[in-house]
Amino acid sequence: ISYQQQRDAAEAVVADVQTAGTRALAVQADVGDEAEVLALFGAADAQFGRLDALVNNAGVVDRAQTVAEMSVQRLERMFRVNTIGSFICAREAVRRMSTRHGGRGGAIVNVSSIASRLGAPGQYVDYAAAKGALDVMTLGLAKEVAAQGIRVNAVRPGLIETDIHASGGQPDRVERLAPNVPMQRGGRAEEVADAILWLMSDGSHYTTGSLVDISGGNL
């Protein structure tokens, strides 16, 4: 379990996993920094010995702005974490899981966003574009490694109750926009996790290259 800032939250997840009777490890890492990603995977190698699955869940958003207002620094951060970081992590996972590299196969699940197809105009076009790139990576990598025993899919959450809205300066965003969702509510993180678990499980062993929307019908 990697984290950048919320150590207590990461350690709480580790505790939950251990209570359930299995092992877990929390490692601080910035997924946009290659050296830190290499250290993260090295720690996992030392602790667990092999890799079976990767969930690319790291993501950032910024304050709502139009493209005309965005700085290069903001754009670089958005793509470094949301896109490049996922590429680096996927690369390291493939090197460990691919049957071509002596691995046993596995699954990669990228956490994208329905913003990738809606565009998020007037708010987060940069975030939407970074997630759109993640969608394309999902499709291309799925085809690239399918014969190597690795499945690659993505979930695209919609309006979900998480802290990311507060970090973007809109802590009330879910409550405010929920009436626009066909199901008339925001989603829960657990509902996204359920889809991720299915995509990592043997129940989806013939599914790869899929983009699964978890959006309450927000099309």
Residue spans for each PLM region:
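Alpha-helical segment proximal to the catalytic Tyr-Lys
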Residues: 95, 143-144, 205
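Short, small/polar-rich loop/turn modules that mediate ligand/substrate recognition or access, typified
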Residues: 50, 146, 151, 207-209
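Active-site helix of classical SDR
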Residues: 90, 130
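A conserved structural motif in NAD(P)-dependent oxidoreductases
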Residues: 181-192
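Residue(s) in the substrate-gating loop at a strand-loop-helix junction
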Residues: 113
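Short C-terminal tail/terminal secondary-structure segment
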Residues: 61-64, 118, 196-197, 208-219
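Active-site Tyr-X3-Lys motif and surrounding loop/helix of classical short-chain dehydrogenase/reductase
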Residues: 39-46, 65-69, 73-80, 176
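Catalytic Tyr-X3-Lys loop
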Residues: 68-87, 109, 134, 183
